[in-house]
Amino acid sequence: MTSIALFGAGGKMGHRLTRNLKGSRFEVRHVEVSEAGRARLAQDFGFTCVPAEEALAGAEVAILAVPDTHIGKVAQSVLHLLKPGMMVVVLDAAAPFAGHLPARPDLTYFVTHPCHPPIFNDETDPEAKKDRFGGVAAKQHIVSALMQGPEEHYALGEEVARTIWAPVMRSHRVSVEQMALLEPGLSETVVASLLDVMREAMDEVVARGVPAEAARDFLLGHMNILGAVIFKEQPGVFSDACNKAIQFGKPALMRDDWKKVFEPEEIAASIRRIT
């Protein structure tokens, strides 16, 4: 049985991972520094946390389920306890991309992140429909990267990833650099920003007299069909009027050079701000 030391087990993400690892083939040792987190694990799962030294003794994998800003500090604090050949799993590309992981060529660094349940899905179970984050009942895709380490370690890393993010559909292999393009680049800098603009636009039409419920229903419904056509979820074309609105709308909303947010220096700057 493969042993895993789970750091941050009582935090928000660690709690999710604890639930999915319970009952798996992995033997999990839980590490949590906060009293509230330890109490939560004991109450919800009946687990008792152990010191880092005990958790890492004989463990083959260490999962750092801690905030991006703490990854480097936590990794450095247990560096002397990590035996050669051990796998360290990180749940976001930011800290690895920023160089916050210790320089230990004898360790395997594996990075994995969920895509979250897609907007277009075939879920019918009410619990799955409500699981918008993923990892509980709704199926989702994931991305993973073998940052360093033997190629044969990828299979174990992917098995861990499929377990902690279950239920999983497609598992995509990417590089850490590609994962940084996906987040924060694509998902946060672009998508979250544009969604925030959409919310502001909805608030604006409400301020101009449209009933709030009508504005929300109209926006979300149009997001569904427009998104289905744009992302080729279903065949179809926009009306001439819609295409004309896009032609004149994009220049009014977007800078000509907006794609520079994907340039390496911009991605690096974005990651520095969050780590």
Locate the predicted segments by residue.
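Rossmann-fold dinucleotide-binding core
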Residues: 91-183
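NAD(P)+-binding Rossmann beta1-loop-alpha1 motif at the extreme N-terminus of oxidoreductases
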Residues: 1-45
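Rossmann-fold NAD(P) dinucleotide-binding segment
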Residues: 56-101
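NAD(P)-dependent Rossmann-like dehydrogenase/reductase catalytic/cofactor-binding core
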Residues: 138, 206, 210-275
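Amphipathic alpha-helical segments within well-ordered protein domains
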Residues: 199-206
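A short glycine-threonine-serine/GTX helix/turn-capping micro-motif
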Residues: 183-192
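Short acidic low-complexity segments
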Residues: 45-59
